[in-house]
Curated annotation (Swiss-Prot):
<dbReference type="InterPro" id="IPR009479">
    <property type="entry name" value="Herpes_U55"/>
</dbReference>
<dbReference type="Pfam" id="PF06501">
    <property type="entry name" value="Herpes_U55"/>
</dbReference>
<protein>
    <recommendedName>
        <fullName>Uncharacterized protein U55</fullName>
    </recommendedName>
</protein>
Amino acid sequence: MFSPQLNHVLQLVFDCNHIVSNSYQEIILKCRISSTKPGILFITDGTESETEDVLFDVQFLEKTTTIKIKILPISRTVPVRIHLFSIPIYLPSHALEIDDINALCQKENIDPTVYEQYGLTNMPISTTNVINQFKVVQNDSVEMSLILFNLNWTESPYQSQKLDRYGRKLLIVFSVFSIDTRECPYWENLFKSIIPLCRVNMISEPGISIYKIEFNDPFLTVFLRNVVLPENKRRFPITKECYLRLTFSPPDRSTVTLNMNMPYFKICADGKNLEVFFPNDMSLVSNTNKEITLRGEFTNKKIVGIFIPVQTHVFKLYPFLWFAQEPLKLRISCERTVSVTEHDMLGRVFFVTKKLFRKPFRSLSNSDMKSLLTHTENTDKPFDVHFMGNCFPAYLLPELTLHPLEYEDKPARGNPQTLPSVEKHSIIKIRI
C-alpha cells in the first residue's frame, strides 16, 4: 500500500526501458503532490548525463496538484532521475501603479490604445514649471498636488498610425517633468529605502494620461501622454497647462516592487508572477543573437527574480537569475526570421529569497537546468541542492508530499506512453 511521505526534495528514479519496449518513446509521468508552503515547484532533471532527459518545467504549487512530468525520447543507458522541490515566492507589485480613472473613462473615445508601448524611452527632462503641494493623508500616504506650466510636447518617432472610432488619425505626444522628493518634508520618513505605490487621483485635462512613472531617489520622473487630432503638421491643438493630484503610499512588505511602470511588465491574473512581453514590434533575424534590455528594476537586495521563458519553437530563450538594481536583459535567438509584436510574451519572473540564489546564473542550453544532490558531512543537514549555478541546503525548502493518484485522475487504458500512477512502477523515493 502506498503511503505519502514528507520530503524537502523528492527524487524519482526508474529505468524507462523496463516500462516501454521502445526507449525512444516519449513518456509522461503523472503524480499528485502538495507542499507545506505555497510556492513554485521545479521539475528538474537529476540524471548525470550531458543530455536533457527530463523536460524542465515550473508550476505554481498551492494545494494538492496533479502534475505531468515529460521524459524526453532519447536513448536511456542509465536510470532517469527526477528531482522535485518547491521554493516560496514573493508576490510582484507595480511600485508605481498607474490607476488613472481619467484615462479609463476616455479610453473608448480618445485613446483606444492607452496602454500600448510606443517605444519612447529616452526623452530629455523638459523645463516644465511645477508647483508642488504636499500633505499627509490617511494610512501614512502622501498626497501630491501638482500644477504644471509650459508643458513641452514631443511626438514619438516610433508610433504606428492610430485611428479613432470615426476613422480620424490620432497623434500621440509626450511630455516629461521631474519632482525633487527632498522638497517633501514627509517623504524621507515614510518612504526611506523603499519605492512607494502611486495612485492617480485626478488629471484636469481629459486627453492627458500618465504613460509611466520612474523613481530614482530622490527624483520622481513623470511621463505624460496626450492623444490629439493634429490640425496640421506644425501645430498641436493641446494644452500647455495641467493639474494633477497623486497619492503615494508604502507598498506591502511581502511584495516585490518595481521602480517603473512599463507596459511590457504585467502582473499575471492570479498575481503570482510578473509576465514579460516584447517592448515593441520587431523582427528577429535567423541565426542572430539579439539582446533586449527592458528598463525597470526592483531594489530589494534580499530578493532575486527567476526568469522562466515561454515554451515556444519560434525563438530560443533560456532561464536566468535577475538581481536587484539591474535592468532585465534578455538574449534571444531563432533559427528563422520571424516577426513578433508587443503582445507576444517572452516569459515569466518569479521572485524568491536570495538566501538560495546568491551567484549570478544564465543558462546557455536546456541541459544547464539540471539539478544535483550531494551529501554533506553534517548528519542533521545531510543533503545540498545544486541548481542554477548555486548550492543551498535541502532543509531550507518546504516539505513536499507525494500522494497516490485518485481514480478519476488516472488516464484511460491502452496508452502505453502514459504512466497511470507513481506507485505502480517501482519508483524509488529517497527521503531528503
